[in-house]
From Swiss-Prot:
Organism (species): Burkholderia lata (strain ATCC 17760 / DSM 23089 / LMG 22485 / NCIMB 9086 / R18194 / 383)
Protein family: Belongs to the UPF0246 family.
A Pfam family hit: H2O2_YaaD
GO cellular component entries: cytosol
GO process annotations (BP): response to hydroperoxide
UniProt name for this protein: UPF0246 protein Bcep18194_A5551
Length: 260
């Protein structure tokens, strides 16, 4: 079983890492190619391209200037500890044991506009480059064209080491990021967990809660060493419960109704 997550825009390089082990990203050469292109942009160009504030554009202008093909704990941090958004609050990697993180290293992958595909312990230098950014390169008009089928092939290398029910990809990423994966080329079926909360008289996806729940699901898989997708139906964290009637073989729906 492989779980894919989206990255986070918010990063934490202040909290010391509680594990010393780390690995190097697989697609450093590709990331370096993107950085070379990003370095040609002015802060104003970056602000316009990414629709961000001038201070944030200047910050990322400097990040691109500082970025190096040499990754060390001095200039980088393990990805799953550096990302700090809603998904990663749910995953809460800083409270996972070393054994849990070792398991996550084999089963969790993070999709990234700059790095392509990251393992949890891959060192991450700070950046901002969302997968949906229309940043043209020699490979095409945007990052989906840039990455092509590279991410899918890398996932297949991992999926092909699994067998039986364990050969499955659990999509806990956003639509924007999962578009970088080509499901028809995957060597495994895809299961997408969907999290809905009751609001305004009906169940609906509420972004903040759904993002956190994706992280909770990834943690549930890691802590329980789940390999059979049927066991995903037992997920019942923070009030969510599997809804068989709303689900099918490729979409597992979890619903929560609180505060009434």
């Amino acid at each position: 079983m492989i779980i894919v997550l989206s990255p986070a825009k918010s990063l934490d390089y202040d909290t010391p890492a509680h594990v010393q082990s780390y690995t190097k990203p697989a697609f450093v050469d590709d990331a370096s190619e993107l950085i070379d292109g990003l370095r040609k942009l002015s802060p104003q160009d970056i602000a316009t391209l990414m629709d961000i504030s001038d201070p944030l554009a200047r910050l990322n202008f400097q990040r691109y200037a500082d970025w190096s093909t040499t990754f060390t704990p001095a200039n980088a941090k393990q990805a799953v500890l550096a990302f700090n958004g809603d998904v990663y609050e749910g995953f809460d990697a800083k409270s996972l044991s070393s054994a849990d993180l070792d398991y996550a290293q084999q089963h969790v992958r993070v999709l990234s506009g700059l790095y392509g595909l990251l393992r949890p312990l891959d060192l991450l230098q700070p950046y901002r480059l969302e997968m949906g950014t229309r940043f043209p390169t020699a490979r095409g008009k945007d990052l989906y064209a840039f990455w092509g089928d590279r991410i899918t092939r890398a996932l297949n290398e991992q999926l092909e080491t699994r067998s039986g029910a364990a050969r499955v990809l659990v999509n806990c990423a956003s639509t924007e990021y999962f578009k970088s994966v080509k499901p028809k080329l995957l060597a495994a079926p895809v299961i997408t967990p969907v999290f809905e909360d009751w609001k305004g008289g009906r169940y609906k996806i509420i972004s903040f809660h759904a993002k956190r729940a994706r992280g909770l699901m990834a943690r549930f898989i890691v802590e329980n060493r789940i390999t059979d997708p049927k066991a995903l139906k037992d997920f019942a964290t923070e009030g969510y419960a599997f809804d068989a009637a709303a689900s099918n073989d490729s979409t597992y729906v979890y619903r929560r109704r609180v505060g009434e």
